[in-house]
């Protein structure tokens, strides 16, 4: 019986999660004329597609090469990789790592390497996306329909800004039902960088929740 409080807490968490209604984000005004690109690909799929962008060979990795600082040493580090291609045939090898902290923790590292050009490398460092196209800032997005003015901020997406101009948005409010917006007036290389980063953030959220449920299952088993 000493484990009863822990079991009850886990049950309450599971009931709460199961009762959460799907969230519908509010599209920023200057994104409303940009075509929405729904993400096609289920939770455990090895492939994701949206618009003319395709992520495939998605798989977990055991490596730890991007997050080596001591402040993350006590956390379980999740790493994954995938290939990104476009309708034009450009291909990038993509690799990411993040610590299993809170879902809205900003610590995130990715590299996007052009298969055909070793000098074409994109780097995602927390909320900064750097490449030969320049630096893009990523900000958390918290606006959704029905949000109460006094409620705590809930992360529902990410905005991409180039010199304070909004150029992209990724909706991660509903796992396995994500959507991406990328300004089509951007040069192709910058679009690819935003697409690769968006794919990485989508996979991060999916894998965080996957790890979260695995921990719940393990803790439930340990109480018996």
Regions found by a protein language model. Name each.
Residues 12-13, 103:
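Residue-level signal for mature regions of secreted extracellular proteins and peptides
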